[in-house]
């Protein structure tokens, strides 16, 4: 539920390496 300051509209979350996932076009973590 914590925003990772990254969007995933056009490309996947680079922050996925930190445990972030795409939700509502924004990368979130927990």
Curated annotation (Swiss-Prot):
Keyword line: Disulfide bond, Plant defense
Native source species: Melicytus dentatus
A Pfam family of this chain: Cyclotide
Placement of covalent cross-link Cyclopeptide (Gly-Asn): 1-30
Disulphides: 4-20, 8-22, 13-27
Modification after translation (UniProt): This is a cyclic peptide.
GO BP field: defense response
Name of protein: Cyclotide mden-G
KW Disulfide bond (keyword) present: yes
